[in-house]
Amino acid sequence: MDSFTGRMAEADALARANRWPEALEAYSEVAASGRSDFSFHLHYGTALLYCERHLEGRDQLLRALRLRPDSVDALNNLVCAHFQLGAHVAAEEACRHILLHQPLHDLAWSNLGLALASQGRSPEGIEALHRAIDLNPSNRVSKDNFLQVLNNIATDGAGLAEAHLTLCCDYSEVPEKALPCTEGRRIRIGYVSGDFRQHSVAYFLAGIFNNHDRDAFEIFCYSANSRVDWMTSFFKEQSDHFQDITGIADADVAHRIESDGIDILVDLSGHMLDNRLSLFSLRPAPVQASYLGYPATTGCPFMDFRLVDSLTDPEGADAFATERLVRLPVPFLCYAPFPNAPEPSALPALSNGYVTFGSFNNATKLSDDTLDLWCHALDSTAGSRMFVKAACFSDALACEQLKKRFALRGIDPGRIECSGMITGMRDHLNAYGKVDIALDTFPYNGTTTTCEALWMGVPVITQVGNLHAARVGLSLLSAVGLGGLATTCAEDFAALAAAFSEDVHQLENLRRRLRTVVAHSALCDQRRFTRALEEAFRHMLRPGP
């Protein structure tokens, strides 16, 4: 065995142990030898993906596929690379390639569902995910993917709740633990998330971690994702204990949580990527709560509480939740703006001579209802244009597909500008300088994008529905004193867009002062919010309703 063959074996062993940075170093040494065979390119590409080097990883996987075009392993990993690069049309094509040769491949159907939804084609995505679940009813990932996508188009509370109950009925029943006595000691809160990094969820956690009463609460973080960045360092510094649980078996993590004596275990992911709901099913803590990262009930019998507010979940919403709803007396989340955000730009309408509407929401939220609303707004405002930014629009075909959807509704595609992924947070925020008025998505409202728009001086018009996901815009806008921008029908949505567009001086004035308004609003009152959250935690530990 030559040295490079031995080093390849070492790299493979490190990869099997999930020691990806070390594995990548070893594969890189093998690459320097000039090795070029299918197995090497597949494994090297996979290691690059795990180390966040997605473009290089994709290139290695493409080299592997040139040597073995129908390799399902390489194609599946290529799908992951395409997702990370925002190339959702290419991800769809790779999934269809797999299914051409293996039509019963449930993972390919599941990924196809996500790829379609990521292009705003959620109904087609739901069909593909149905197929994945039918082929493999025990695959938890496909069920989670299905529920994620369903939120993009759901308007019926009973139907959404039933879907969650049905797909979560396979979790085993585990007896509840007795409520702990916390008198004379700090309450131990455990947060479980795959997003302790630069991620949308992190911007709503930062204020909490900055303001927790550390004399009264001991903070534990259980990270379900090994990716790290400057935000990860922040969470490590602002918690008492930080544990990476990536790749560790649920039973072992549950034992660790029990040993840590956690009083309340808080899930921050729901059915989203990197969730550990299966860990919660073992009931490692006496009280378990869902918060922030998911816009609906989990449907899980082992989740005791869900944190909301009275606007997102008014009276009657309890009927659609398996958890007990705890309504905070403040907005259900608190925004911590990006610390180095650029200043808001001048109003673009003043130099353009027309109003530009915009959306920076994930393309999964671009439902038919959303496009209908936006087209009403464009119809009502002569000369107006629409700027739509989402990762998938780095692909020209995805842009063409979106413009066709506008054209089918009578809107000239020339009025629509698409933008793909923008690297760097400052550049991303600077792109709001192209937008005069943001239009929200429906029935799944924006959250981070709404907060970003407001911080950059851009007002947001939202449509209010019946479910939590369709009421987040109302909560956010009300928190900054702009509840009047929340409408309840398409006619009012369009009328409000037209009225705003006719008074650019009012828009300019609002743009100049909006950041100050937001900074001093309930949306950014981190201390007040954290005190309310801590009181909610104390409530959860009291016996009775």
Segments from the language model and where they lie:
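Nucleotide-sugar-dependent
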Residues: 272, 440-449, 463-471
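Short acidic/histidine- and often glycine-rich active-site loop of Leloir-type glycosyltransferases
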Residues: 470-481, 486
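A conserved nucleotide-sugar
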Residues: 216-218, 375-404, 408
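Alpha-helical solenoid repeat scaffolds of the TPR/TPR-like class and their adjacent stem/linker regions
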Residues: 1-354, 362, 368, 372, ...
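Active/binding-pocket-proximal capping segment
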Residues: 392, 409, 455-456, 467-470
